[in-house]
Amino acid sequence: MTYWLVPIQEDMWDVIRDKGIYGYKENLEEFIKEGDYIIIYVSKYYAKRYGGKIVGIVKVLSNWYEDQTPIYPEETVRNKGIYIYRVKVEPVVIGECDMKKILDKIRFIEDKGQIAKYLRNAPANLKRPIPESDAKIVEECLKESLLNI
């Protein structure tokens, strides 16, 4: 069981959650495989609600495939596929976990003074998997957020 962190733009979350498809502009099959888990982090850029938060953990249900069909908001505006390398996913847990809330508990962000370098690109964390112990902390944070609704 391998966990990966990926940053997304906020408007991609609805598609990932509702259609069960995660896409990226490059093929990530070297890293993320069927059966792995993706921790979805919403970057702060242009975010209105979820910026700086982890919004879910999804399980990868397929191998990577290429699909040019525009499904994400940025793609539909341009009428062109951008995040054309895709995998089918299903939510394991959905919620809102503010990174600041768990920063002192997680190990994968080794340099707390340079948090951003661990939260960019895909997969994030400098292209390294997330330790399972950190994934469990994230999962608990997401579940706690559901209790506070």
UniProtKB/Swiss-Prot annotation:
Which pairs of positions does the record mark as disulfide bonds?
none
Please give the coiled-coil regions recorded for this protein: none
- Pfam family, any one: EVE
InterPro entries listed in its UniProt record: EVE_domain, PUA-like_sf, UPF0310
Q: Which family does it belong to?
A: Belongs to the UPF0310 family.
Q: What is this protein called?
A: UPF0310 protein SSO2595
Q: Give the organism the record lists.
A: Saccharolobus solfataricus (strain ATCC 35092 / DSM 1617 / JCM 11322 / P2)
